[in-house]
Amino acid sequence: YLVLQEIKQPSIKWFDRNQKFIKEDLIPDSVTRSNYHSLRGLSCPFNLLGDKIYFHTDLMPTIYEVSPNTSPKAIYKFELGRYSPELYKLKDYEKKDESPYILIADSKISDNFVFGEYCYQKYFYRVLFDKNSCKKWIIPTNMELMDIRNNHSKVGIKNDLDGGFDFWPRRVSKNGEIYTWYNVEDLRKKVQQSVSKQMKNPEATKRLKEMLNGLPEDVKVIVAVLKEK
């Protein structure tokens, strides 16, 4: 997770998310030897996969791909689809237009998956997309919204995502499982903050911390499977 910032043409300097300069010997030769002319003046989060750069800007629901000496092309787009009301409100059904605006908070590209996090109507959602099977899983990051006792929805999560009915775990997966992902760096920070607070389950926090500390350095994302009780 870096910030790409070009200082002088055609030189590109590399910084981490804290604006700390990264030495060129830490950047792959295939990148440092290329100009990436089309990215001049751009400063935004991006992923590097092989010799391709994937990036998004804050105000566009689109992930772009750019190769050395080529212009960016749209490769993935976050679309919410059309809204359908809950089952118990079908008699009041009214179609709504597709949402023209969502905010991508984070995106990561791997060989087999696209990981995304976006904000829509003040709620954050995570997307796990399988590039091979084209299957996707979408869940809110605030798990309190998945409590059917919550007033947010009488039957589950308000589905502004793909035009289907509201859903609770039984409508996300036939087996009552929900898939999500976590940024390892952010999760470490949250665990560290939790250690200093009084936790309801300190033993679980301890196990999570030990698991994170045992991860290889090149692991950036954790995929989690949540099982409905």
Annotate the PLM regions:
Residues 34-36, 65-67, 85-86, 126-127, ...:
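A short, polar/proline- and glycine-enriched secondary-structure boundary/capping micro-motif
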Residues 123-151, 189-206:
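C-terminal/domain-terminus segments
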Residues 15-20, 66-70, 130-133, 229:
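Short loop/turn segments that connect beta-strands within beta-propeller blades
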Residues 83, 121, 185, 228-229:
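Generic structural motif
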Residues 59, 70-72:
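Charge-rich, low-complexity N-terminal segments
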Residues 19-41, 73-98, 137-163:
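Surface-exposed loop and turn segments in beta-propeller and other repeat-based domains
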Residues 1-6, 11-13, 44-65, 101-126, ...:
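Short beta-strand elements that form the blades of beta-propeller/WD-repeat-like
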Residues 190-228:
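C-terminal functional modules
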